[in-house]
Amino acid sequence: MADMERAPKVLIADPDRWSAELLVELVRKARCDAHLEVLPDSQSVLEHCRTGWPDLLIVDYGLPGIGGLELLREVRRQRRHPPVPFFLITERVDAASVRAALPLAPTAYLAKPFNAEDLLQRLRNLLLEPGEELACPVPSVPNMQSLEEYLGKARETSSGAPLLKVVHEALDHAMQSHKRDLAELQPLFLQDPQLTGQLIAAANSAGQHLGNSCQTLDQAVARLGSQHSLNLAQGLALQRSVDLTDPLLLPHGERIWQQCQRTAELARWLAQCLEGDGERCYTAGLLHLLGDLAVLRSIQSWRDLGGEELTAEQVEEALRTHGAPYGSALRTRWRLPLELRQLIAAAYQLGGGVYSKDALILHIAKLAAELPEGEDAAQLAKHKAARMLGLDATLLASLPKLGMSTQASASSTKSSRS
């Protein structure tokens, strides 16, 4: 067990919340008992250091205020012995920028996008003695809160949904084998609501926002870059309770994941048939039950912290009560683009006024995905959304089945309608 009296104090200063969260997870992975502080600007860092020096500073070059380089200069002016370890993360890798930093002796000068595995090893080398291993106890539920109390408080701080097991295993393998080929992983990412949602959120953050919003995974990866996208994904894989391991929760998770993927596939198929935005419809379909998945992850966290065993009825009641509020809170807190949030909302109900084609598509796709297996979707032809889209019973009856290539099916259907 780690000795909390010697647990290192690590200060992270990065204006981008997603990058800061990645750094937090890497520090926790390297040293599970570290005391962490995350600060948004250089003034906060200086004020914090005046009250007590950390054992390590990890600072972004573009930190608001005097900036990362000047902050390093100010830290070195204090002439502490030994010098405070200082990792400077920067996009400036030109010779002049490197020469400007060298006299200030940064412990590490890390170019963006940095290699997460390399940074993790640097952190271990700095924060652990050679051969040292730590085992940190899992905290318990404060005062043994009831599940309802825990879920009510966790809604505004929830990290989101669990990862699909196949995605988590692939990310673990990539980190352990030092393989960083996003092209191999991206098809898996497209199936995972949590990864898709967080990469889109990161791509639309203030630090990344350039012009139009990103509303699909491909757009997000193009803006973030493959290496930073993979870093953020690996950071997610390091988070606590990111797997559903409770046998009672797994069937619920599998059902909801399948519902998300089925809605996404049908929405894209219909959009391709009707000349809508297929990838945007796919994204909204994949994310429409993000809140339900986040509730399951919070229940898993509650169980990991020592919460009592539950019944299936209790889990179902928690999903009914908290699924929609969790989803709304997450989409707002992640600052997903308003247009994407409105499209996700259309899965549940069509508001007043003019309906966009994509909104109608998503609404009918969700209804079709909820039909029991083997039930004919032709019955949906009478629905308002189907009538407004001009969908007849014949087309609805030809909706692709689970596991069928929706793209190939849509192409052939579109040809027959031409």
Question: Where on the chain are the PLM-derived regions?
Answer:
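Conserved alpha-helical "signature site"
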Residues: A2-D3, A116-S301, L305, L310, ...
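Two-component/phosphorelay signaling modules centered on CheY-like receiver
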Residues: R17-E37
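Acidic, metal-coordinating helix/loop segments flanking the phosphotransfer/catalytic sites
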Residues: V38-L56
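Acidic catalytic/metal-coordinating carboxylates
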Residues: P40-D41, G67-R73
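Active-site residues of response regulator receiver
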Residues: L57-G62, T90
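Alpha4 helix (beta4-alpha4-beta5 surface) of REC/receiver domains from two-component response regulators
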Residues: E70, V93-A108
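A short, hydrophobic beta-strand element within the central beta-sheet of small alpha/beta folds
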Residues: R73, P83-V93
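A Lys-centered signature of the CheY-like receiver
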Residues: A111-K112
